Swiss-Prot record:
Residues 101-162, 185-243, 272-330, 335-391 form the CBS domain. One of its GO terms (cellular component) is cytoplasm. This is Protein SDS23. Residues 32-48 have a biased composition (Basic and acidic residues). It comes from Saccharomyces cerevisiae (strain YJM789). Pfam families: CBS (PF00571).
Amino acid sequence: MPQNTRHTSIVEMLSTPPQLPNSTDLNSLSEQTDKNTEANKSDTESLHKSISKSSSSSSLSTLDNTEYSNNNGNSLSTLNSQNLLSVHRQEWQHTPLSNLVEQNKLIFIRGSISVEEAFNTLVKHQLTSLPVENFPGDMNCLTFDYNDLNAYLLLVLNRIKVSNDKITSDCQNGKSVPVGEIVKLTPKNPFYKLPETENLSTVIGILGSGVHRVAITNVEMTQIKGILSQRRLIKYLWENARSFPNLKPLLDSSLEELNIGVLNAARDKPTFKQSRVISIQGDEHLIMALHKMYVERISSIAVVDPQGNLIGNISVTDVKHVTRTSQYPLLHNTCRHFVSVILNLRGLETGKDSFPIFHVYPTSSLARTFAKLVATKSHRLWIVQPNDNQPTASSEKSSSPSPSTPPVTTLPSLASSYHSNTQSSRMANSPVLKSSDTSNNKINVNINLSGPSPSQPQSPSTAMPPPQSPSNCPASPTPAHFEKEYRTGKLIGVVSLTDILSVLARKQTHHKEIDPQMARKQRGHIG
């Protein structure tokens, strides 16, 4: 197979922080500031305050078509809000939360709407969570996310038990279930709220403890203006890293040096600052992976072979790929097969290698880890120890396939049904994970719980060929080739957004004793 036809990956291009816009203007501004410092310290402080004020008074959602100028006429060019690029002349810890507010992405749902309506809203707006209001202006919301959706699916499939018998009965008899009831079934952390005048030094103490998101309010704390998630904060810090020189020492450090992740396979238990490695065998059924994520209260799980080598990743958001009737047999197929399916769904564009790579090495730099988390939009990366005949951590920098953004999933309603057994008959009209239909916005869910029979032809949704090789070869590789290309070594650890934010908090803020496992301990897990 040709070795030099692979396209440059996005991850490779993100191995160093992206350039800020108009670096010439910024350098000029910096030089002018230095001159002012020598001439008049008070003038310099005034300039810094002016820039900081300009930055904090404008949320990222209103930066489009805006131009700022300092007192000396130096223009700070238009910034694109979608790139999360902003200009700062300060340390990252002092950045006000107002800089990260995206009011255009703040969408509430009522607790009285059905689970399927809530799911449709997630898909429509390409969000991963939604605040659920009990009444307009509710300041103590619970959030609806894909973990709740997974719990709902498992409840409908009679794979889990909850104390609310009515909810159980309604789910399994096809009745509409209010989303406000479903979000109560999954343990949640408190709904943290901070005013927009607070800074990142404050919020990182919360997000670094494992809380996934924080509500940003107005100064009076009477109105929610936006939601700041762990992933958005990581993206913001990465894309503005060149504006924060104090980040560089950490970004240049390796995961091993920072003691992030379980880096010793012989260790019985990770330390309190490290995340547990939770995996599932590739030959186990997908439904078992979804159940394990529910029990362990995690949002993704590693898929490994019998030797412990990493062969893939399944996220709780992938539950959206088992929503059509034709896709339900996937639940009873293997995790290994599902990995190939979701890679296909993420797509190959014009023969480019667009596979997201969810792994790093112990010697990978924090910058490299930042880049991959941003590029894959993932909450965690798996740490692997490469085999002797596989690429080293250093060679990974020039050989990683590029990640891609998954396409928006369209889930049309289904008009037909089949009732192959008692369970599927009971669930035939259950509105599980339904999608909007342009005609009637109704979903008819029909689940074949028996799984695909050996003689039954697979539907187009499930009978997807293995992904093509990155060399533009027209022939699809065999499963063995798929594993050879993308199995990266023995799974020895995991690094999450929480791990990284907790390190930033301990190293560069006053939160020296932060426990990255605190929020997860609060949520608990089912033994």
